[in-house]
C-alpha cells in the first residue's frame, strides 16, 4: 500500500533532525539556572551595555547591502540545481536560466548605479 520502506533514510533523517533540537531545548530548560530580575529583563547588545534607547535605527546602506546579498543568495539557490542537471534538461531550460541571470545582472547594475554597494 504505502511504500514507506523506500524512504527509510529520509524518515530517519527527519526524525533525528527533529529530535535533536527538541532534546537540546529540553536539556537547556532543565539545566539552565532560573533567574528573574532587572538584569534578566535588560536588553543585550553583543555583550555591551546599550547606551540610550535600545531601538536605534541603522543606516540604510546596511539594509541595501543585506538586500543585495539576499538576492544573490536566492540566485545561487535557484541556479545550483539547474547546474547539477544541466546535461539532462535541454536548450529551453538553458535559455530560461540565461534570462534569469540577465535579469539579475541588470538588477545588480541598477543597485551599483544607485550606490547600494558603497559604504560611504
Swiss-Prot record:
Transmembrane segments: 9-29, 60-80, 88-108
Gene name for this UniProt entry: ndhC
Pfam family, one: Oxidored_q4
Entry similarity comment: Belongs to the complex I subunit 3 family.
GO cellular component: chloroplast thylakoid membrane; NADH dehydrogenase complex
Domain of life, per lineage: Eukaryota
Lineage: Eukaryota, Viridiplantae, Streptophyta, Embryophyta, Tracheophyta
GO MF, any single term: quinone binding
Protein name: NAD(P)H-quinone oxidoreductase subunit 3, chloroplastic
Protein species of origin: Morus indica
